[in-house]
Amino acid sequence: VSITDHYEPLGGHVSMETALRRVARWQDAWPRIADAAPRDADGRMPCYSFFYPEEEYRAELLEPLAEMTRQGIGDVEVHIHHDRETAEGFIRKIGGFCRRLRDDHGLLNDHNGQMVFGFIHGNWALDNSHPVGVNCGLTGEIELLRDLGCYADFTMPSLPSPTQGRIVNQVYWCTGTPGKPKAFDRGIEATIGGGVQGDLLMITGPVGLRYAGRLVPRIEMGEIAANDPPTEYRVRRWLDLAPRIGGDIFLKLYTHGAREDNADALLGTSTGVGGLQEMFRWLHEIAAEREIEVHWASAYRTFTAVEALTGPLHPGFRGSPEPIGSIAGVR
């Protein structure tokens, strides 16, 4: 089980004072929620993944997240909002951001001796997937991410956006046509012992319908928000719909947790318990009821769990021992 937060402290063009207050709230509340959660099968607390926007970098906003990472209850990965992008600009931005996260804050993980990162695309427009080309502009983004050391993309699902790919409820490999946008629209499902089967690994969240308490079905896509908080019924649907590799279930949830309304729903307020605290309890109880062994995971640990099933994976390597990530100065 992983939570991938499109974590945007400066989202909505707020002041630095507001952004600092947003981050401080998480630094105060999240450690207590993680500590109170049921331990998983390995005795671990939940580990929250903050996908932080490259364009919002401020050292004073990142350092509290780095502190939670050092405590073992958080991790920081890469997020970006861009438009009319070029390959050269993208390499410079991602490479520079990764170096800054590592050199200034000790963040990002190493895999096979190379620094790697997980990725979420802002405004959902991964690989220039919006029909009119907005919010990206970079066809071939999948291949660049692969070569820069991205171990997996966590953007999907994106309904009702037209950027949504055709493949749902799978952990899969992109196999789109080079030179054409939306390479993740085609792919091969990750399988036990299958190894690398495409350009980039896609770890997607649950997609389906839910009916309880509704006259008209609602689309379920694993988002936790103020207008769609966790419920016991939703937890059951997540486990029904989540991607599988063999008998293992990979449940990826997402949110925009820096926003005040969503932070209220996730962390709680002075008058109410937050949705995360209840969600962890429901997940633990329902998993036990279904005889499922729970593992709380960061985005990176989710990737390593996939690798344990598929066999060795080599993010940042184009089928050769030379780390292609070095084109951006990423080591």
What are these regions (language model features)?
Residues 106-251:
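Active-site-adjacent pocket scaffolds in enzyme catalytic domains
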Residues 49-132, 155-156, 253-255, 298:
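Metal-dependent polysaccharide deacetylase catalytic core of the NodB/CE4 family, i.e.
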Residues 1-74, 82-84, 115-123, 143, ...:
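Active-site beta->alpha N-cap acidic-glycine motif
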Residues 16-36, 60-62, 90-101, 134-144, ...:
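Well-ordered, non-membrane alpha-helical segments in soluble/globular domains
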Residues 147, 152-166, 223-331:
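C-terminal domain-boundary segment and adjacent tail
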Residues 2-4, 43-49, 73-77, 116-118, ...:
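Structural preference for beta-strand elements that scaffold enzyme active sites
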Residues 11-24, 46-55, 81-88, 122-135, ...:
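The substrate-binding groove and active-site-proximal loops of carbohydrate-active enzymes
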Residues 7-10, 53-57, 81-83, 124-127, ...:
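Short, solvent-exposed loop/turn segments at secondary-structure junctions
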